[in-house]
Amino acid sequence: MTTPPPAARLDVIALDCPDPAVMAAFYAAVLGTEIDEAESRDADWVQLQRPGGRAGGGVALAFQQVADHRPPQWPGAEHPQQLHLDLAVDDLEAGEAAVVALGARKHAVQPGDTFRVFLDPAGHPFCLVVG
C-alpha cells in the first residue's frame, strides 16, 4: 500500500499578538535566528527566517498583529489556548534561565517535571522540553 502524496505542506505557523516586532525579537533570540525582512510585510506581520530556507522545507514562525488581543488562559477555559509551542533544549535549568532573561515568565502551574511552561511577551504559553 502506498501513501498518497500530501495535499499540502506546513509552511508558516502564525501567532496572533499585540506587537509583532516585540514577539519576533523575543522568539528570534530564543531560537537563535533572525527576522526575515523579505517576508515581513509591514508592522502587522513579522516573520522569522526558516531553518534551511523555503527550499529546505523549513517551517517559518510569524507574528500577526491583532487589535484587542487577549492572551490565552492556561489552564482554564475562559479564553483557552488553541496552540502552543514545544521548544527543545539540552538542559531545562539553562533553558529556563535563558528564556526568562529574554523576557519570558515562568507559569505558576507546572504540571510535570520533564518540561516547563512559560508565557511569552504576549502571554502565549510555550514549553521547554529536553530533546
Predicted regions and their residues:
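Core segments of cupin and vicinal oxygen chelate
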Residues: 2-8, 14-61, 94-97, 101-108, ...
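Short, solvent-exposed beta-strand edge segments and adjacent coil->beta transition regions
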Residues: 8-12, 80-84
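Generic beta-structure capping elements
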Residues: 51, 64-68, 131
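A short, acidic/glycine-rich surface segment
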Residues: 68-74
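Catalytic beta/alpha-barrel core
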Residues: 86-88
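Short beta->alpha transition motifs characteristic of CBS
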Residues: 110, 128-131
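Short, acidic, Ser/Thr-enriched surface-loop or helix-capping motifs
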Residues: 120
